[in-house]
Amino acid sequence: VGPVPPGIPLPSAPNCVGTNLAANYGLSSNTWQRTPGTIDLTGAAAATLLFQQWVDMDDFGNLDRGTVRVLDGSDLSGGTVTELGVVQANITGFSPGAWVEFSAELPAAALGQMVALEFGFVSDDFADSDASGWYIDDVEVLVR
């Protein structure tokens, strides 16, 4: 978490989350960032995830990609977490030039529970295709 690299204006300053805030992402990366605390969906009939994203990654063959997972919020302290569902399994793109809004319904298995969101990123080991990465800002869950 920190300031975005130079040349990428933020939707709302001063911070965002990204793959590497100081340089291009590394080869063979496997990183994740979870929401701090839990999100209460115990009374929810439906829930929508919204966030702003800026994507600049190798999308040749979808080997470099972002993933958004929903985790059981009561099971985050151990070495193993329980996945309740995948919101998006294959976020890719190459230099869109602007922040864009991501919107998706959370899976039914998450409703009625305390949850956490996990934003994961993996990359291949091809040296000629590293890029800035995946940056996320203004995350919110709309509960209905």
Predicted regions and their residues:
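Short beta-strands within extracellular/lumenal beta-sheet-rich domains
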Residues: 24-42, 99-103
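Extracellular beta-strand-rich recognition modules
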Residues: 35, 41-57, 66, 113-124, ...
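Extracellular glycan-recognition surfaces and repeat-rich motifs
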Residues: 1-29, 61
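Extracellular ligand-binding interfaces
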Residues: 45-88
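Extracellular/lumenal carbohydrate-interaction signature centered on repeated Trp-anchored short motifs
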Residues: 27, 39-47, 94-96, 109-111
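Extracellular carbohydrate recognition and processing domains
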Residues: 78-110
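Low-complexity, Ser/Thr/Pro-rich intrinsically disordered linker/stalk segments at domain junctions
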Residues: 104, 108, 121, 134-136
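Extracellular carbohydrate recognition
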Residues: 28-31, 60-61, 124-143
